[in-house]
UniProtKB/Swiss-Prot annotation:
The protein's name in its UniProt record: Acyl-CoA-binding protein
ACB domain boundaries: 3-88
Basic and acidic residues composition bias: residue spans: 1-16
Annotated SUPFAM superfamilies: Acyl-CoA binding protein
Family: Belongs to the ACBP family.
Coiled coil location: none
Length: 90
C-alpha cells in the first residue's frame, strides 16, 4: 500500500476517534490533514472573534514547512497513536 492510500485509510479511521479526543489533538490532525491535502496555508488568518476557525488556521500554519509526504506520514502516526490510546483506555 502506498503512502497516499495509507493516508486516506487513516483519514477514515480518524473519524472513529472517541469524542473525548482532546481539541489539541484534533487540531494537530486538522493541520496535518490540510498540509497533506492542500499544501501551505492559502487563506488569511480569521478574525479574533472567530476562535474556532482561528485555532484551525493556526494549527495548519504550524506545520506549513512540511512536505506533503511528511504531513501524510505524521498524520498516519498521530492517528495510530490516538487509536492506540483509545483502545488502551477502553
Amino acid at each position: 500500500m502506498g503512502l497516499k492510500e495509507d493516508f486516506e485509510e487513516h483519514a477514515e479511521k480518524a473519524k472513529t476517534l472517541p469524542e473525548n479526543t482532546t481539541n489539541e489533538n484534533k487540531l494537530i490532525l486538522y493541520g496535518l490533514y490540510k498540509q497533506a491535502t492542500v499544501g501551505p496555508v492559502n487563506t488569511s488568518r480569521p478574525g479574533m472573534f472567530n476562535m474556532r476557525d482561528r485555532a484551525k488556521w493556526d494549527a495548519w500554519k504550524a506545520v506549513e514547512g512540511k512536505s506533503t509526504e511528511e504531513a501524510m506520514s505524521d498524520y498516519i502516526t498521530k492517528v495510530k497513536q490516538l487509536l492506540g490510546e483509545a483502545a488502551a483506555s477502553a
